[in-house]
Swiss-Prot record:
GO terms for molecular function: structural constituent of ribosome. The keyword Cell wall biogenesis/degradation does not apply. Pfam families: Ribosomal_S8e. The gene is rps8. GO terms for cellular component: cytoplasm; ribonucleoprotein complex; ribosome. This is Small ribosomal subunit protein eS8. Component of the small ribosomal subunit. The ribosome is a large ribonucleoprotein complex responsible for the synthesis of proteins in the cell. Belongs to the eukaryotic ribosomal protein eS8 family. Residues 1-40 are annotated as: Disordered.
């Protein structure tokens, strides 16, 4: 039997059975879930009603993630799935769905921050820098350019929780697109109260 999104196969509110008045219709069809996994990109196209296309992501490993407080969006690697409010099974199988909490690579965001503010981010005291990083952070600048960076630095404060994550090289993020519908895993970096909430949830899950 095909997957059907009708309600005439259900019993009535009073408990009585319904006689099927017609066969299943094309407009009532449903399709199996894509269960998008972590891995090299694999996307299938599905022809849907009206001749339109849906992009069914079967495997994904990168996505566009937005760092809201800094208005910065970067393409970055998805490392792992760590939490899902609806089902722990989806965490175990590393399934990417909307609103699941994942770990993403922090390198693109750190590069942007260091070039934008000329300040180190998530680096240990006295850590060795590569020549390129040294050039970005400790370059001699003209007075005009230095003034511009000083003005920017007034807003360069980062929460201790985020700084801790940058030191580990991984950021907690949330997927806000629907990988099984649009074929992409895009989302945003968790910050503030939302980050605290999910850290508590993840810690509680580990403690079990």
């Amino acid at each position: 039997m095909g997957i059907s999104r009708d309600n005439w196969h259900k019993r009535r509110k009073t408990g009585g059975k319904r006689k099927p008045v017609h066969k299943k219709r094309k407009y009532e069809l449903g399709r199996p879930p894509s269960n998008t996994k972590l891995g090299p990109k694999r996307i299938h196209t599905v022809r849907v009603r009206g001749g339109n296309k849906k992009y069914r992501a079967l495997r994904l490993d990168v996505g566009n993630f937005s760092w809201g407080s800094e208005c910065c969006t970067r393409k970055t690697r998805i490392i792992d799935v760590v939490y899902n409010a609806s089902n722990n099974e989806l965490v175990r199988t590393k399934t990417l769905v909307k609103n699941c909490v994942i770990l993403v690579d922090s390198a693109p965001f750190r590069q942007w921050y260091e070039s934008h503010y000329a300040l180190p981010l998530g680096r240990k005291k006295g850590a060795k820098l590569t020549p390129e990083e040294e050039d970005i952070l400790n370059k001699k600048r003209s007075k005009k350019v230095q003034k511009k960076f000083d003005k920017r630095r007034k807003n360069s404060k980062i929460s201790p929780l985020l700084d801790e994550q940058f030191q580990q090289g991984k950021l907690l993020a949330c997927i806000s697109s629907r990988p099984g519908q649009c074929g992409r895993a895009d989302g945003y970096v968790l910050e503030g109260k939302e980050l605290e909430f999910y850290l508590r949830k993840i810690k509680a899950k580990k403690g079990k």
